[in-house]
Amino acid sequence: MRKIFTPLACSLLIGISLTACSNENPQTTDTTFQLNSSILPTRAPQLNANGGGTFSKNDENTLLFQAPQGTLVKSFTYTYGKTYYWNELNLPSSHKELQVSGCYPTITTSTPTLFAWDVRNASVTADLLLAPPVSVTPNTTPDIRLQFNHAMHQLQIELKADGTTLQQAACSQAKLTCRNFLPIANVNLLQGAVISASGDKSSLQATGDKATFILPPQAAGNLQLQVQLSGREYTFDLATHQIAGSPITLLESGKSIKLTITVSKTSFSVTGQNIGAWESQGESNGSIIL
């Protein structure tokens, strides 16, 4: 199983600047558009410790141009560092106004309103950034600004030895398992949103004192966390823990829950269940005995 390290927060702002080249002949007028992007805490290229950063040359986004009624007109792969012109898109002249949504990494699909994103797919990152649609007028709108956010949920686990009966080095041998989650996020790329989660109940495992599991948004339901350490194991239901006095019932899109578990030779004490900087969802406390 893979161990995923994903920085804490998520919000990506993209500005598409369109600059018209002056020409008296409208048939030869070319209008360029350019993505000027920044990533405020997220998972993508060149990030700092808090998840902020920028896309780099040759990184790619998928832009989805759609009619106001929500039907796909054109899917377009934008590569950072290149210059593009509106007329390269070959958009139908009948559409005077369009909407544009986006995703990162790039996606090619014939069913953009129902795309299956499987977090177990080892060939791509488990994380997915989506931008809901904004309105544009081709060759008129000077700036298109897309707000990208994490579509998945981030569940972080951290073990901390008590330092008396157990040293931190011992925690590096722990096996951390997240199980009974639904692995497939059903995504509407045109809306830039996750519709539901589906698939057979699945597990992901990591070794060490820290792990991050990227999961589709879903009900906490039967989701379990298992800690195996020093020949012992403990399994607990996520839904039995609380955040600010309320049970954890839902793993929300774009949010992160962090469980900080203090470990001794006789017990685990869940001292922090806190929502980190993707966007905070909560923190919980409890104890588990080996």
Residue ranges and their predicted role:
Residues 172-184:
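Short, surface-exposed alpha-helix to beta-strand junction/turn motifs within ectodomains of secreted
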Residues 23-170, 177, 200-201, 205-211, ...:
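Short, low-hydrophobicity acidic/polar segments
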Residues 242-290:
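Hydrophilic extracytoplasmic domains
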Residues 111-117, 233-242:
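Edge beta-strands of extracellular beta-sandwich domains
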Residues 17-20:
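C-terminal motif of bacterial Sec signal peptides marking the signal peptidase cleavage site
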Residues 69-77, 167, 182-190, 196, ...:
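Surface-exposed loop/edge segments in extracytoplasmic proteins
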Residues 1-9:
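Bacterial N-terminal signal peptides that target proteins for export
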Residues 82-88, 194-200, 242-258:
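Short, surface-exposed linear segments at secondary-structure transitions and domain or protein termini
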